[in-house]
Amino acid sequence: MTAPHTPSRRDETLGLWLGVLGVAIFAITLPATRLATGSAQAPQLSPWFVTVGRAALAGLLSAAFLLATRSPRPQQAQWKHLGWAVLGNVIGYPLLLGYALRSVTASHAAVVTALLPLVTAAVAALVLHQRARLGFWACAVLGSVLVVAFSLLRGGQQGHGFGFETADLLLVGAVVAASVGYIHGARVTPALGAERVICWMCLMALPFTLPAALWLWPAQPVAPSAWAGFVYVGVFSMWAGFFAWFRGLALGGALRVSQTQLLQPFFSILASIPLLGEPLDVVTLGFAAAVVATVVVGKKLS
């Protein structure tokens, strides 16, 4: 009888750094998407084009990877979960995020999307009928209250009155969409392998995303910075980042490496300073830290 494999110290260290790399890649998604779509005052690429275009780019890369590795096709029962993952992660999250980032800063979005790990756990509890402790739900409610308070505060500061911005509702929708996609993707990961799940998702969507991207190709000139943001979210956010992230989880252990997700909102805020010229806002940092704290405590109580 062989002993179960345990990661070596070297694997744990490499896995941790790969996890940090993956989180950093995902964190830059917010400012890169803002670069690609522009603002309401100076729009660049349409959110629909960015959504289908980034997925098409990742789909072409995925096709090459799956062919090169001679990956077997998913079984019939697995396509349903891949389809839900496509709707949540390939279409829903980037589309809602793209529209939201035309109205709010990337730093603002980082605070709202910091709830993603907690919402994912809540969706898992509801969809997979997993029981969670009362303390977990208390943290989920507290984290949601913090996000609501932040959104109301920002609305008042911008002269819109104390009420939700449409962008805040879009961001919440994006978080829910991503969470649903993550849960369904996770259900087929043990059988397919983590890297292949994202590849099959992108390839599954390619018959729709590639023609749609060509149809929606911008007719007007677009700033080079917008194209740079688009290429980033297609190559890195939608594809390469998952390779670093999943490999890090495998090498360093999912429990340990997944904690690096807590750095993501801070990486997003910091990346927005040089990429978008957004100021370092103490209030935004404070709310981000508070939301992350609810995620930390919530995970311990789940």
Predicted features, each with a name:
Residues 25-30, 66-113, 149, 234-252:
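Specific transmembrane alpha-helical segments of multi-pass solute transporters/efflux pumps
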Residues 49-60, 88-89, 97-131, 135, ...:
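Specific alpha-helical transmembrane segments that line the substrate/conduction pathway
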Residues 62, 123, 132-154, 271, ...:
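Hydrophobic transmembrane alpha-helices of multi-pass small-molecule transport proteins
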Residues 23-27, 58, 85-94, 116-117, ...:
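Transmembrane alpha-helical core positions of polytopic small-molecule transporters
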Residues 42-92, 119-123, 142, 176-184, ...:
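Transmembrane alpha-helices of multi-pass small-molecule transport proteins
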Residues 1-52, 158-187, 208:
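Glycine-/small-residue-enriched transmembrane alpha-helix faces in small-molecule transporters
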Residues 31-44, 102, 151-164, 213-230, ...:
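Membrane-interface helix termini and inter-helical loops of multi-pass transporters
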